[in-house]
Every structure is written in structure tokens, then in C-alpha cells.
């Protein structure tokens, strides 16, 4: 499949298609309710990121999307990548925009492909589009708070143990981590509370169709770790 890649600045007509239900459904419903995601995708904010948002088109159909965000790194208070990962880099980018601080780095946020577009190097093509964008903007580095795409199969395994489990090829057993390493990336650190999703028990029931009727750990399909439930506080994380 030959994939043409455009920024949403170049092709604003593709914006509604990038958010059409077919691509939205690539992610579990609960994944759409991170406070950081709501900040990034809010219309006034997202309008400022169109140079860093990509649509992949094949045979006239949008079959892939990729989002990234520019931010300032190696400045006061940001000498290291954040433990908050995905969430924190969005907040950093938001703070930079609000204060007029110039960005010097790019962070990938998401690459999603419909099943028909997977394989054949399309995810690498989208990564390359991000790297080319960063180079054009004069950014020094490209980072990615990678969400391992098979970790949900072992939700109780600590993330560090999962990441350090290697296959016969010497790469992590997780195919998405392996893709980034083969593309020239390196693992810098674990972000222990990246993409934290907080909601009331009613919220989580609505997102998952499950009953949250007891406190403790609950395994939720698609989650990378057990969801921590408090009936007493009417909250789950």
C-alpha cells in the first residue's frame, strides 16, 4: 500500500477524516479521556499544532494518522525527560505556547493505522515524517513516550520487566518498541505515570461497560496495568 502523508496544515480538508470513527476506534474508549488528551485536542490548542499532525492517505482514503507536539527541552526545570511522559510533554508544550517560549524539540504522541494499512513500513513512514518535520523546524531532537502495544497482554508485569524482556533478535519482545529501536531510537527511561487516566466509577463503567463494584485492582481490557479502584472515594485510576 502506497501511503501519501500530509500535515493537516497542508490538507485541512482531511481533519474531520482523521477524527472519523474508524480511526478513533483504534483506541479503547477510556484512552480518550485523559486530561492531557483533552488539553491537546481542544480546538483552540490543536489549531496551533497542525504542522505537527499528519494524515496518511491511500487510494483516496485516510488510513492513518500521527500526532506530535513541539516543546522546549534542556531549559530550567526540564533537564530530564518527565516521569509523566505523554501527559507531561503535552503540558510542557501548552505552557510554552502560553508563555511564548520557543520550542527546540519534538515529541511524538500517537501513530495509528487502520488494519489494512499495517505492515509494509507505513508506521516507519509516519515516524520519518515526524523526523523530517523536526529537521525542517530546526529542532534538535525527537522524543517519543512510546506506549508498548502488547503490554496489555501482561498487565500485572512491571513495565521495566516488560521492556527489558528481549527476543532472540536482542530487541524488546514488544513489536512497537522494536520498531522505534530499528528506526534509530534508544530507550532513555521508563515514564511510570505516563497517560494517567482518572475518572469516577460511573465514568469508568461508561467507558468500559464493566462494573466497578469493589475496591482494589481491576483488570481492564486494553489497559497496560491494573486499574486501581476506590469505592470509598468513587474514583479509579
Question: Where do the protein language model's features map onto the residues?
Answer:
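Conserved acetyl-CoA-binding loop-helix of GNAT-fold acetyltransferases
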Residues: 113, 118-136, 141-144
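Short amphipathic alpha-helix that is part of the acyltransferase structural core
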Residues: 1-85
Amino acid at each position: 500500500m502506497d501511503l501519501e502523508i500530509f500535515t493537516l496544515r497542508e490538507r485541512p480538508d482531511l481533519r474531520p477524516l482523521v477524527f472519523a470513527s474508524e480511526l478513533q476506534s483504534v483506541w479503547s474508549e477510556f484512552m480518550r479521556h485523559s486530561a492531557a488528551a483533552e488539553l491537546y485536542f481542544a480546538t483552540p490548542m490543536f489549531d496551533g499544532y497542525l504542522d505537527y499532525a499528519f494524515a496518511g492517505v491511500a487510494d483516496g482514503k485516510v488510513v492513518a494518522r500521527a500526532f506530535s507536539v513541539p516543546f522546549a527541552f534542556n531549559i530550567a526545570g526540564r533537564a530530564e525527560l518527565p516521569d509523566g511522559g505523554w501527559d507531561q510533554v503535552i503540558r510542557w508544550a501548552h505552557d510554552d505556547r502560553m508563555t511564548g517560549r520557543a520550542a527546540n524539540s519534538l515529541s511524538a504522541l500517537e501513530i495509528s493505522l487502520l488494519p489494512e494499512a499495517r505492515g509494509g513500513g507505513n508506521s516507519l513512514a509516519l515516524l520519518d515524517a515526524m523526523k523530517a518535520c523536526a529537521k525542517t523546524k530546526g529542532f534538535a531532537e525527537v522524543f517519543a513516550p512510546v506506549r508498548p502495544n502488547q503490554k496489555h497482554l501482561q498487565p500485572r508485569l512491571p513495565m521495566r520487566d516488560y521492556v527489558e524482556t528481549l527476543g532472540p533478535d536482542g530487541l524488546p519482545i514488544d513489536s512497537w518498541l522494536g520498531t522505534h529501536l530499528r528506526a534509530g531510537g534508544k530507550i532513555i527511561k521508563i515514564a511510570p505515570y505516563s497517560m494517567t487516566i482518572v475518572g469516577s466509577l460511573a465514568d469508568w463503567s461508561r467507558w468500559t461497560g464493566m462494573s466497578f463494584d469493589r475496591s482494589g485492582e481491576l483488570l481492564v481490557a486494553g489497559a497496560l496495568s491494573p486499574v486501581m479502584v476506590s469505592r470509598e472515594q468513587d474514583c479509579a485510576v
